[in-house]
From Swiss-Prot:
Secretion signal span: 1-25
InterPro entries: Haem_peroxidase, Haem_peroxidase_sf, Peroxidase_pln, Peroxidases_AS, Peroxidases_heam-ligand_BS, Secretory_peroxidase
Location relative to the cell: Secreted
Record: glycosylation sites: N112, N171, N205
Residue sites binding heme b per the record: H189
Disulfide partners: C36-C111, C69-C74, C117-C312, C196-C221
Swiss-Prot/TrEMBL catalytic activity: H2O2 + AH2 = A + 2 H2O
Binding positions for substrate per the UniProt entry: P159
Enzyme nomenclature, EC number: 1.11.1.-
Positions that bind Ca(2+) 2: T190, D236, T239, D244
Alphabetic keyword roster: Calcium, Disulfide bond, Glycoprotein, Heme, Hydrogen peroxide, Iron, Metal-binding, Oxidoreductase, Peroxidase, Pyrrolidone carboxylic acid, Secreted, Signal
Protein name, per record: Peroxidase 22.3
Source species taxonomy: Eukaryota, Viridiplantae, Streptophyta, Embryophyta, Tracheophyta
Annotated source species: Oryza sativa subsp. japonica
Amino acid sequence: MASATNSSLSLMLLVAAAMASVASAQLSATFYDTSCPNALSTIKSVITAAVNSEARMGASLLRLHFHDCFVQGCDASVLLSGQEQNAGPNVGSLRGFSVIDNAKARVEAICNQTVSCADILAVAARDSVVALGGPSWTVLLGRRDSTTASEALANTDLPAPSSSLAELIGNFSRKGLDATDMVALSGAHTIGQAQCQNFRDRIYNETNIDSAFATQRQANCPRPTGSGDSNLAPLDTTTPNAFDNAYYSNLLSNKGLLHSDQVLFNGGSADNTVRNFASNAAAFSSAFTTAMVKMGNISPLTGTQGQIRLSCSKVNS
């Protein structure tokens, strides 16, 4: 009986793995070449204009894609009003919805109900990085949009700014991403800003931090909880609006803003990867683009699954 049960379990796992593989295989760089040939150029024009107007928007759009993919897969669930948007890691900090809505409206005007919000998010992430001087990559397409979202999963599946190295490795591993992917994707913190409430404990209580850097950050982040919680500081103090490898050099100098940044270089298993990325921009770019493609393949809805939303913030009626 035990043998039969184990065989059945093994078969189920194989089937599940095969289904996941098929879903990823259904994504294609040429998915819209016939159905909406101007989709990518239309999205790019919207994203590039938005990032040129406000550099921080590039980081916000990249973060939207990350927070989408880590919660029930890359399915645009993060764009549905409420639910995931109300989760602790997202509330009061997610931005860029209007830019995605604008891109969606522009695409709908040329190809009605053809291009998914999930694909727009994936393309927007790539175009944001490029607009800030970072590397490009081929975005695989064909995702469909979910009809549900989960605040509970957003609270459990998204990494916290207080995460340890082991917690980060485990969190990413559960999404099919290895430790190198995790360190590379953390390099997205070469752009963007963080709220005081997410780095207060680090700048006042941690010892593995450059003292001058801590003092600089304390000037705009008071010690008392509730005072200046939403005040912002750049995640990369060196080149905050350029997508480069300076983030890793900052870690070598103990100038990581978040606890979850500095744990990447603190005598642990990720130290050598951080050193490599700090000294070799090409190695970082290669690892980052590889990891972005892998992240974009997390549990996509394809074929007849889900829907193509008419409005990214709500399911079709």
